[in-house]
Amino acid sequence: TSVYQLLPLYPAIKIGSEFVRVTETDQVPNVNAARAHDARAFHDEIYDAVESHKNDDEYKNNFITVPVIGIKQPTLQSAELVEGKLVASQVLPQVLAKQPDFVDGDGTVPKISAIPNELSNSFNNRFIAEAHGALQNQEQILQSVKEAISTTQFANAADIRDVQNTIGLAVDDLYLPDEPIILEATVVSQPDIVGLKAVVVPASSDEPPLTFSFDQSQAQQWMLTIPQLPAGLYRVAIIAEGTETQTLPPPVHNLFEVIDRVD
């Protein structure tokens, strides 16, 4: 049931011309309806508890929730039932069609799903251009948490601003042995960066890091094609290059794997 608890609560499955929730259809194959409804009930319990705590001053004053939300990474948003199979897509579901600012996420979790319901309009939300698997190690986030903790004695400390300069990275999770490894990056920076590089570190061996330079394909678009890499798991960091006085977008990190040849 825990896997079902990760499914969207909003209508994210397109069947015909309509978007429905997982619990509203029996047409999706391999879905256990009972577990789907149990998962929805679990979230309803959380919602009810949040509502009851709104009237509990002692509970409200015990802690502060500060969500850290990854953005600017290509993220799957919905799925369409096509010939009996679900096809995932980055297209926003109908319920979010008028919210184009929700079109991204951290590469795993859509932006809308990363924001707790009770904090939908909160200034405590923190947004960072980083991938899901690297959020907990992101230097800017850790520095932000450190500064927030050190200034808790100030009742009205200024809110930490969102990141202006960002890097968004599109990279597949898995590559075949003879398949080129294509990385695509979207860079928002004022002033423009002068270069972009990828530092690829083998995670499953002691081989030294490899550094590759992106080519700029359009104003904010950069592309890198790595012809081949030995089979293994790799960490990749995308790093902007600029002048000494320029404030650069913070690096973005992710993982990918090259599999052994399958005969």
Range-by-range predicted roles:
Residues 1-161:
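Helical cap/lid subdomain of alpha/beta-hydrolase-fold lipid enzymes
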